């Protein structure tokens, strides 16, 4: 009886392992948002090469140059709190976007027109603007940077 059980459980174990294992190394949407958009310290934001450095450091120039990106220089908790602020319609017409109640310190990175991969060259511009983020999950956290206003 014990051998029969193990003959059934052994393949089930590997089936389950094959199902769970691929997600172990995968970045969640919330983690991707943090990697691509959060820089609370903003240590080198005054440098004209800030975007070039950060886009490379945060893996947004692998294989191609990401055309536009925004970094937020506020504590993560403050950005996560946006998910409980004013509900607005997202650019894609979904209803899970939220607008910050106050202007936040941000840096916009725009790929320069003559720039080509692998030499991604970005224009760095600092602003204080309201941000709009899409939120999902439990806990309800930012998973997509939608816009600034």
Swiss-Prot record:
GO terms for molecular function: lyase activity; nucleic acid binding; ribonuclease A activity. Disulfide bonds join 51-109, 65-120, 83-135, 90-97. The keyword Hydrolase applies. InterPro entries: RNaseA, RNaseA-like_dom_sf, RNaseA_AS, RNaseA_domain. One of its GO terms (cellular component) is extracellular region. SMART domains: RNAse_Pc (SM00092). It holds the Pfam family RnaseA. Keywords: Disulfide bond, Endonuclease, Hydrolase, Lyase, Nuclease, Secreted, Signal. It is found in: Secreted. Pancreas. Substrate binds at residues 32, 35, 66-70, 91. The keyword Nuclease applies. Residues 1-25 form the signal peptide. This is Ribonuclease pancreatic.
